[in-house]
Amino acid sequence: MAKEATRIRRRERKNIVSGVAHVNASFNNTMITITDAQGNTISWSSAGAMGFKGSRKSTPYAAQVAAEDAGRKAAEHGMRTLEVEVSGPGSGRESALRALQAAGFTVTSIRDVTPIPHNGCRPRKRRRV
């Protein structure tokens, strides 16, 4: 039995002009997902996916590189305007936003959607360094 030649599926070019950039900046990593208005993912990137490991993933520079990568992929699909939703306490929040603006996107709105508990679960214990 001969193996069938695996067909490489070419990613079709969607023509989406505006979308939403979700920036999730945790203490350990920064993830950027660019979606259309319905929430379907167009492109994504993270500091870890860009080759940063360990504590370097949480740096603002790593977030900037990841945002540039996600923006470049989204621009290939014709995206030009973005709404930005920033979530999390990490250090890559502002640098990812600046990188998206520098990549040529028109940022129409910036929203902070960090979940804040109204005295919900007990937080983890304090670090003593």
UniProtKB/Swiss-Prot annotation:
Gene3D superfamilies: Ribosomal protein S11. SUPFAM superfamilies: Translational machinery components. It comes from the Bacteria. The keyword Thylakoid does not apply. GO terms for cellular component: ribonucleoprotein complex; ribosome. GO terms for molecular function: rRNA binding; structural constituent of ribosome. InterPro entries: Ribosomal_uS11, Ribosomal_uS11_bac-type, Ribosomal_uS11_CS, Ribosomal_uS11_sf. Pfam families: Ribosomal_S11. HAMAP family: Ribosomal_uS11. Part of the 30S ribosomal subunit. Interacts with proteins S7 and S18. Binds to IF-3. Belongs to the universal ribosomal protein uS11 family. Located on the platform of the 30S subunit, it bridges several disparate RNA helices of the 16S rRNA. Forms part of the Shine-Dalgarno cleft in the 70S ribosome. This is Small ribosomal subunit protein uS11. It comes from Methylobacterium sp. (strain 4-46). The gene is rpsK.
